[in-house]
């Protein structure tokens, strides 16, 4: 997914009033404020209730995998662009929760999905540094996950040094 592809998808979602946050590799890049690598997909956190509307707003994208439903949904278009939806619901207390396999639930504070970032100079909501660390630092983390966190840590150190 190129930066232009990401902006196209986000603009379509915004035109339909979809609330989202950018997660994964593009979420790291949003926090850093620049693209740091090529990306095979765009990870977005969205409400489970918005899936039908999202599919209408992104007519070129089709469901290709529901094996992790209702926690995730993978959409792809004929050009091979992929949007990986992290599907959440809101509890009465305002927490976001995601239903994972075997009945397990993961909870997120909504504030952790409201960090500010930039993609192509465009402001976006993205996963916070803390949430990115949680998503990238686990026993099944890939080499790319570890590289992404190092990029984020370098950016944070650089910002702290510039202020200090």
Question: Each predicted region: which residue ranges?
Answer:
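Compositionally biased terminal segments of proteins
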Residues: 1-164
């Amino acid at each position: 997914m190129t930066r232009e592809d990401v902006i196209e998808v986000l603009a379509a979602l915004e035109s339909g009033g979809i609330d989202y946050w950018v997660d994964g590799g593009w979420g790291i890049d949003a926090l850093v404020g620049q693209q740091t690598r090529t990306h095979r997909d765009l990870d977005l956190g969205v409400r489970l209730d918005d899936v039908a509307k999202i599919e209408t707003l992104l007519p070129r994208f089709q469901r290709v995998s529901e094996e992790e439903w209702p926690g995730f949904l993978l959409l792809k278009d004929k050009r091979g662009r992929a949007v990986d939806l992290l599907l959440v619901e809101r509890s009465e207390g305002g927490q976001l929760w995601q239903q994972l396999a075997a009945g397990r639930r993961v909870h997120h504070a909504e504030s952790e999905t409201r960090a500010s970032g930039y993609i192509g100079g465009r402001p976006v909501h993205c996963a916070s540094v803390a949430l990115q660390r949680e998503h990238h630092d686990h026993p099944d983390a890939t080499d790319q996950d570890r590289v992404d966190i190092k990029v984020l840590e370098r950016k944070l150190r650089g910002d702290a040094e510039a202020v200090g």
